[in-house]
Structures are given as structure tokens and as C-alpha cells.
Curated annotation (Swiss-Prot):
GO cellular component: membrane
Keywords on record: Membrane, Transmembrane, Transmembrane helix
Organism: Saccharomyces cerevisiae (strain ATCC 204508 / S288c)
Lineage: superkingdom: Eukaryota
Subcellular location: Membrane
GO BP annotations, alphabetical order: mitotic recombination
Protein name per its UniProtKB record: Uncharacterized protein IRC16
Note: Partially overlaps ERV2 and YPR039W. Disruption phenotypes caused by deletion of this gene may also be a result of a defect in its overlapping gene.
Bilayer disposition of the protein: Multi-pass membrane protein
Predominant cellular place of this UniProt entry's protein: membrane
Keyword GTP-binding: no
Transmembrane stretches, start-end: 53-73, 92-112
Phenotype caused by lack of the gene: Displays increased levels of spontaneous RAD52 foci in proliferating diploid cells.
Length: 119
């Protein structure tokens, strides 16, 4: 049986996993997404996470408001660069959107739903 080492000496701190030599109870083993609490029963530990309506609504809003304009901006960029004389203002706007705003959209796409009650 392999579990994560809890001691903080130098040898075991830098190792990813160490064999369990002490008697650690079953509830103290580290499980992904589960708090280390002895009062949890098994049926609550393995309960699947079902997103609530607020999480689904936020995902739909982010998809329609943020990603669809991104695809439109990329298609406008493709149209402008195939044209021989593109408008410099439109090229600047699409560059600003694709290079500066889009990374923040992707950042909040992954982090904001985690802060919702059901996320």
C-alpha cells in the first residue's frame, strides 16, 4: 500500500510517495476532492458532483458571450489578411481581442465556475 508521506524531514519531503510504515487509519488516506474528516461516511465520499442550474447557466453564458465573438474575430482576421488592403483599425481591434482579451476569457472560463456554489 502506498500513501503520501506526512512527515516533514528532508528525505521524505522531496519524495512524491513513500511506503506507509505507520498505522494510518483508512479515513486519513488522501483521496482527491475529499476532506480528511473521520465523520464522513462512505456514501457521501463517493457521491458524484452534479452541477446546479447556476453552474450550467454560467457555462452557457460564457460560451455564448465569450467564445463565439472569439471565433468571429478569428474569421474577421482571416478575411482581413487575405484582402490586399485591410483596414488598420479592424486589424488592430481583432489583434487586441485575440491577443489581450481572449487569454482573460480563457482564464475566467476555468476559474469562475469553480467559485459558484455548485462548481
Amino acid at each position: 500500500m502506498v500513501c503520501f508521506s506526512i512527515s516533514f524531514n528532508r528525505a521524505s519531503f522531496f519524495s512524491a510517495a513513500a511506503p506507509c510504515t505507520s498505522s494510518i487509519p483508512d479515513f486519513a488516506l488522501i483521496r482527491p476532492g475529499v476532506a480528511m474528516d473521520s465523520s464522513l461516511d462512505e456514501k457521501n465520499i463517493h457521491r458524484p458532483m452534479i452541477p446546479n442550474a447556476a453552474t450550467i447557466l454560467m457555462a452557457w453564458l460564457l460560451l455564448t458571450i465569450c467564445f463565439i465573438p472569439s471565433f468571429l474575430a478569428q474569421s474577421v482576421q482571416t478575411f482581413l489578411f487575405t484582402n490586399h488592403q485591410p483596414s488598420r483599425l479592424l486589424v488592430f481591434i481583432t489583434h487586441v481581442y485575440c491577443l489581450m482579451i481572449k487569454p482573460f476569457v480563457l482564464y475566467f472560463w476555468f476559474l469562475f465556475p469553480l467559485r459558484l456554489p455548485g462548481g
